[in-house]
């Protein structure tokens, strides 16, 4: 029965439709895997919710076999612990919200559950989505299913959606919800050898998603194939009047556009992404995939995105400033942790000192400094101006090209026991942050293995609201590259 865990979402759906196996059988084998997992990917398990969804799915499939049944009906999924789930603990992996149980459902998880998906539980993450390795969780780090060949060293899964990526790579679930602020879906997907996609900013509602940086936060998905990502994205995207930034643009059936035809498409390669610190192995695969796309009929051209070098400092200034504002609500008064004290101000201070982890405190301090009266113009306003320039670089580039091909991360995953400097950690996001600042859709696709036997990935960036075309290009890359997803013994 463990073979069921290795099926794609589409294969699971076909098996359920043909009654080759029941949804209850499918879910039970995944529940058993989750109960025995050693990756620390799941922090809250919801087997009762999953079995209930499976029984409902079996009833639907026994009564109806037409195309009106959702492709996610009865499919085992995980939800990043950043999305509020009604009646199920939602912590953002912080001591501050250790015992918080929401009274409402986030829009994207609600859409997923209404499609019939079976939620196996809530997934580990960096605290309040602040991190690039999933080592900043109150509930402990997540382990990657892949290990270094030379020494058997465990490696990080990436972050902040490390639990989402590790659970999918480890065949604990077929797909997972994640969030992407500066690359938190794409970078862990790259490290874990799976597919991670974020849509255009505004495609998915942010209602019920615990805020980190509101102008950057966007829901995304992690799966084991591009076609599976398309199925999940078309389920969770759509207008929501509860989110003022939600787009009213119609959402096409993304999966219908995956046909492998990219003839005449212009693919841009930005020269600024060939920077110091990028591994030779990444460069090799970048050039190889570019050549493959040419053979498939695409035109590959050099482009320039001149303000790329400012993306990392601009991103960390803006996201830290927004985080300092968003996290001001955690004061021990309304909900979450409270540390009692005789004086109100002391209660605020003690609560936040105990409730927040080191990385969250660091970013709050950076953000508060950037927003302070003496530095607002010097830092925050300038960062917003340069963000506009970065966005304009992309707009100008897309006047002449259709898609952009860049690495997802500069290197393979680093060791779990390594303790890199926070500044070094920032560099891990160097290739994902620009698309986030511009609000563009992007997808990370595994393209091969390093000499250490660890996954390497490239990223396709699409124009605004062109997720369908982006997914199609990604599917061609996926087909051209040898399949690297396997259970790592």
Swiss-Prot record:
A single BP term in Gene Ontology: translation
Active site per UniProt: 80 (charge relay system), 160 (charge relay system), 184 (acyl-ester intermediate)
Reaction catalysed by this enzyme: L-glutamyl-tRNA(Gln) + L-glutamine + ATP + H2O = L-glutaminyl-tRNA(Gln) + L-glutamate + ADP + phosphate + H(+)
Pfam entry (one): Amidase
Highest taxon of the lineage: Bacteria
Keyword Lipoprotein tagged: no
PROSITE patterns in the cross-refs: AMIDASES
CC terms in the record's Gene Ontology section: glutamyl-tRNA(Gln) amidotransferase complex
GO molecular function: ATP binding; glutaminyl-tRNA synthase (glutamine-hydrolyzing) activity
Enzyme Commission numbers on file: 6.3.5.7
Keywords attached to this entry: ATP-binding, Ligase, Nucleotide-binding, Protein biosynthesis
Similarity annotation: Belongs to the amidase family. GatA subfamily.
Biological role: Allows the formation of correctly charged Gln-tRNA(Gln) through the transamidation of misacylated Glu-tRNA(Gln) in organisms which lack glutaminyl-tRNA synthetase. The reaction takes place in the presence of glutamine and ATP through an activated gamma-phospho-Glu-tRNA(Gln).
Self-association and partners: Heterotrimer of A, B and C subunits.
Protein name as catalogued: Glutamyl-tRNA(Gln) amidotransferase subunit A
Organism: Wolbachia sp. subsp. Brugia malayi (strain TRS)
């Amino acid at each position: 029965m463990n073979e069921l865990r290795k099926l794609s979402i589409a294969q699971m759906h076909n098996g359920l439709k043909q009654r080759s196996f029941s949804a209850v059988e499918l879910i039970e084998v995944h529940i058993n895997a989750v109960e025995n997992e050693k990756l620390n990917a799941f922090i809250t398990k919801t087997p009762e919710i999953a079995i209930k969804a499976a029984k409902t799915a079996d009833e639907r499939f026994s009564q109806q076999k037409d195309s009106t049944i959702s492709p996610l009906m009865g499919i085992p999924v995980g939800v990043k612990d950043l999305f509020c789930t009604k009646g199920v603990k939602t912590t953002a992996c912080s001591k501050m919200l250790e015992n918080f149980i929401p009274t409402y459902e986030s829009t994207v998880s609600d859409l997923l559950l209404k499609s019939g998906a079976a939620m196996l539980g809530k997934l580990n993450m960096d605290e309040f989505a602040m991190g690039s390795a999933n080592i900043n969780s109150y509930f402990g780090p997540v382990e990657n299913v892949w290990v270094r060949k030379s020494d058997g060293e465990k490696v990080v899964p990436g972050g902040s959606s490390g639990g989402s990526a590790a659970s999918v790579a480890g065949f604990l679930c077929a797909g997972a919800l994640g969030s992407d602020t500066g690359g938190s879906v794409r970078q862990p997907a790259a490290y874990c050898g799976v597919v991670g996609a974020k849509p255009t900013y505004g495609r998915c509602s942010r209602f019920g998603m615990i805020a980190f940086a509101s102008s950057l936060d966007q829901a995304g998905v992690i799966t084991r194939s591009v076609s599976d990502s398309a199925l999940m994205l078309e389920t969770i995207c759509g207008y929501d009047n509860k989110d003022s930034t939600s787009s009213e643009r119609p959402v096409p059936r993304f999966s219908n556009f995956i046909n492998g035809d990219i003839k005449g498409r212009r693919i841009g390669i930005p020269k600024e992404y060939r920077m110091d610190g990028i591994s030779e192995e990444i460069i090799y695969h970048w050039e190889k995939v570019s050549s493959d796309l040419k053979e498939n009929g695409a035109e590959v051209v050099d482009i320039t995105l001149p303000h790329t070098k400012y993306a990392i400092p601009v991103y960390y200034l803006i996201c830290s400033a927004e985080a300092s504002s968003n996290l001001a609500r955690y004061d021990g008064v309304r909900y979450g942790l409270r540390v009692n004290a005789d004086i109100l101000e002391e209660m605020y201070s003690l609560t936040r000192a105990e409730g927040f982890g080191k990385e969250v405190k660091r970013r709050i301090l950076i953000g508060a400094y950037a927003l302070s009266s003496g530095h607002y113009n010097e830092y925050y306003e300038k960062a917003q101006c340069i963000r506009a320039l970065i966005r304009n670089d992309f707009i100008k580039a897309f006047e002449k090209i259709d898609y952009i091909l860049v690495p997802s991360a500069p290197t393979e995953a680093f060791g779990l026991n390594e303790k890199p400097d926070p500044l070094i950690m920032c560099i891990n996001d160097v290739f994902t942050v620009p698309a986030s600042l511009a609000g563009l859709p992007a997808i990370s696709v595994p393209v091969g293995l390093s000499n250490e036997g660890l996954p390497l990935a490239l990223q396709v960036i699409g124009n605004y609201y062109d997720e369908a075309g982006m997914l199609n290009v990604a599917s061609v890359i996926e087909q051209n590259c040898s399949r690297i997803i396997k259970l790592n013994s």
